[in-house]
């Protein structure tokens, strides 16, 4: 048996630790259900990582399915309320919808939770400036 065959067998046997868009039913409960199955399979408690939830939101923004995207971003914030990236995700979703005031409120929260050393800090600053400019027009 080749190493590639063994890898393929294990790859398909175990659930990925990272939920993909095609595995998301559109219901937030499906995220919890998926990670309950992963946890059971691996014998340890695993929760959806913050970035996985946020990436699902970005995916649905890209498909212009804003209702799903906003629901995911809000769920991300509920699960990770101290994570600035979660608020920036929501800000991005609202910005893409043209909801600039809501986007600004969310990015302001991201900035309140981050420091200048945070990887996304400059992204938040740039988004805040852009939104403030859009709201002046």
Regions found by a protein language model. Give the residues of each.
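C-terminal catalytic histidine-bearing segment of alpha/beta-hydrolase fold enzymes
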Residues: 1-46
């Amino acid at each position: 048996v080749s190493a590639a065959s063994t890898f393929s067998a294990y790859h398909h046997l175990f659930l990925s630790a990272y939920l993909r868009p095609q595995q998301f039913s559109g219901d937030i409960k499906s995220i919890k259900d998926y990670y309950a199955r992963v946890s059971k399979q691996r014998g340890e408690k695993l929760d959806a990582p913050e970035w996985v939830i946020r990436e699902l939101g970005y995916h649905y923004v890209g498909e212009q399915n804003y209702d799903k995207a906003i629901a995911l971003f809000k769920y991300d914030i509920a699960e990770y309320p101290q994570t600035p990236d979660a608020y920036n995700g929501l800000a991005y979703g609202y910005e893409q919808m043209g909801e600039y005031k809501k986007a600004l409120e969310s990015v302001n929260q991201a900035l309140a939770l981050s420091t200048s050393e945070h990887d996304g800090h400059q992204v938040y600053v740039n988004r805040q400036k852009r939104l403030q400019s859009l709201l002046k027009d």
